[in-house]
Amino acid sequence: MKIMIFICGEGLGHTSRCLALGKELLAAGHEIEFGAYGYSRDLVEKTGYRIHEIPSEIKLVGKAGGFDLSGSIEATLKNARILGGPKVLKLIKDFKPDVVVSDSYYLGTLAAMLLNIPVYLIINQSNMEDFFKNRGVPIRLLGDLTKKFYREVFEKTDKIIIPDYPLPYTVCRKNLNFSPGLWEKLYYSGPLVKEKYEEVEQIPLKKPHIVSLIGGFGYREPIFRKVLTTAALDSGINYTLISGPSLDPSKFKEIPKNVQILRFVGDTFPYIRSSDAVIAPGGHSTMMEALSFGTPILSFPDEGHSEQENNAAVIEEEGYGRMLSYSTPPEVILECIREVLEDKKYRDKVKRLQRLASELDGPKAVRELLEKEAGKKVS
């Protein structure tokens, strides 16, 4: 089959799971092309896949550890391209795919629908209107319009793929709210993770070891600094801090001896596998990667970002790790780290999810779904 994969470029998690799916599809002999923008486009290109530049849809901005909704809406409108729709339509017409897979990229979803091409939508959040709750009246009205728009899109897609564990283990469950009429369209694939636990080699890290994955947004710098302060409180716990592409490690002058800082790392899986816990924001894909590798999570969701806060709340409630905040002092962060390291229940719970991820094999499951459903229409 010929398959077009569209990727939302806000947050690298969309890209990582689409690369996982692309790897699986290519290995099975399918012809794949990607559409992406921003960092996502760069990552796909570096991987060596065929990639097309597509118009951006959403622009996320923040400040001092918080998600700035009004600023994000303004930035999105400023970056909107009037001719974006025709460009995406032409891209699809030129490639002539048998099926379109869209990871939260709605312009590509609508274009596929317009051309009567089967479309499979990958999302880990359906209640986007929650972003707009308790805001000013104009933004609340925008939330109502958003809800109606997404409901229409969901009804017209061939399938909605949730790249998460099936219930009751679904980490993004607080972000999902589908009407009963859509339930038969939902497909819980399991995590879409590019590497398999058993295929990733461990690296020699001094134990116990914490890896911090702070990436994407410069406004997460305060928590980066706070982790450095936390590390200085106990030299017996070792840290690797991966700063992300928008944060320059050279700006940090006093680095504790038990800390190494790395710039953007192309492959974080060896660090996730070899560490005893992962410090991360509340992004869904990073959580899926950590849990698929059986590593507990210390989550610092972006303040005001309801999707991340909901993900982190499930991590806390289910005992997969701890939910912290940007206001949590270093002394408390350290105690939470010690708790996760010392209390066996955290490791036992995430090891169960590691086994389940292996059994589900998300990329393979989605490939087989596409072959079974879209492949029938092609033949």
UniProtKB/Swiss-Prot annotation:
Keywords: Glycosyltransferase, Transferase. It is an enzyme of class 2 (transferase). The keyword Nucleotidyltransferase does not apply. It comes from the Archaea. Its EC number is 2.4.-.-. InterPro entries: Glyco_trans_28_C (IPR007235). The keyword Acetylation does not apply. GO terms for molecular function: hexosyltransferase activity. Pfam families: Glyco_tran_28_C, Glyco_trans_1_3. Belongs to the glycosyltransferase 28 family. This is Uncharacterized glycosyltransferase MM_1636.
